[in-house]
């Protein structure tokens, strides 16, 4: 397929490259020129503007947005509405709030422009391993763009979740679970680190990957973290929250579903900004490993 990609950050740039490797044609646009030039070297078709990107696509046109949630998504949709026509498709692959996705889909309906919300997991490793995709929208439209999902995802790694908003809802809960998992691992390593024994956290995170009931990809990343910096002394225990954890807690409250672990892990991140905690340093380091998220180092203070 031929697709437009707007937003060439850590995720958008790698997704563009994976699509190119899968023999898709990708027209790219970004607010700054550097990432466009970099993508063009790998075979992408550069665009000078959103209008230029749309002009270079065949009908029905498919445009993937990989920009930060909130205003950037709305701004790009407003710009795209000037040029897209009935049955053209906008895919929002960012971490948008699911209710915003519902509103955006509704606002596009009068023009006949189709909207697909797609939760994307895989972080900086997605180029090599593939991205887990959770998407929602009109079923016929989603079936039409399935070749894109098939290329981006590993085998069995993409799922049609339901109508507009459902993809980002599933991704929201996915990230809420991630909050709880990271918190549990980090607290465990903090208990190990503070024990009377001289324990090798790298070796422990390694052995737990073989046959243990707690084995996971996160432990593989933990092994990398502790190999590079066994004490995490250079890190501040400051952990950002990206929004989805908060939204998951809010959804749980609205739906009268108790979610104490996810709630506690969110509060722990907020509290991390005023504490010196080994567990919070561990979470910060792990988030950097899987998502390329920024870490705050003591030298930055």
Stretches found by the model and what they are:
Residues 1-62, 87, 124-126, 288:
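NAD(P)+-binding Rossmann beta1-loop-alpha1 motif at the extreme N-terminus of oxidoreductases
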Residues 15-19, 80, 104:
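Hydrophobic residues within alpha-helices
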Residues 20, 40, 102, 109, ...:
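Anion (oxyanion) recognition and catalysis
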Residues 31, 44-103, 109, 127-136:
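Rossmann-like NAD(P)-binding element
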Residues 47-48, 91-92, 114-118, 157-162, ...:
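General beta-strand structural signal in soluble alpha/beta enzymes
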Residues 76, 97-186, 192:
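Rossmann-fold dinucleotide-binding core
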Residues 134, 144, 165-293:
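Helical "substrate-binding/catalytic lid" subdomain
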């Amino acid at each position: 397929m031929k697709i437009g990609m707007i937003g060439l950050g850590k995720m958008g740039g790698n997704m563009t490259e994976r699509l190119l490797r899968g023999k898709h044609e990708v027209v790219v646009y970004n607010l700054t020129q550097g990432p466009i030039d970099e993508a063009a070297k790998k075979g992408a078709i550069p665009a000078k503007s959103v209008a230029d990107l749309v002009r270079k696509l065949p009908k029905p046109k498919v445009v993937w947005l990989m920009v930060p949630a909130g205003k950037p998504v709305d701004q790009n949709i407003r710009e795209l509405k000037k040029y897209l026509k009935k049955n053209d498709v906008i895919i929002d692959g960012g971490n948008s709030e699911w209710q915003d996705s519902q509103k955006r889909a509704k606002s596009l309906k009068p023009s006949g422009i189709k909207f697909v919300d797609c939760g994307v997991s895989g972080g900086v490793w997605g180029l090599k391993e593939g991205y887990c995709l959770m998407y929602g929208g009109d079923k016929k439209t989603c079936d039409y763009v399935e070749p894109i999902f098939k290329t981006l995802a590993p085998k069995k790694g993409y799922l049609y979740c339901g109508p507009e908003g459902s993809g980002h809802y599933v991704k929201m809960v996915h990230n809420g679970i991630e909050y709880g998992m990271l918190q549990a691992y980090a607290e465990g390593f903090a208990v190990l680190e503070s024990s009377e024994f001289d324990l090798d956290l790298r070796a422990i995170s390694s052995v737990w990957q073989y046959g243990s009931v707690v084995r996971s990809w996160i432990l593989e990343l933990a092994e990398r973290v502790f190999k590079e910096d066994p004490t995490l002394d250079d890190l501040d225990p400051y952990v950002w929250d990206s929004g989805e954890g908060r939204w998951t807690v809010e959804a749980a409250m609205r739906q009268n579903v108790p979610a104490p672990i996810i709630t506690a892990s969110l509060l722990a991140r907020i509290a991390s900004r005023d504490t010196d905690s080994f567990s919070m340093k561990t979470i910060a380091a792990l988030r950097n490993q899987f998502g390329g998220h920024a870490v705050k180092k003591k030298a930055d203070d």
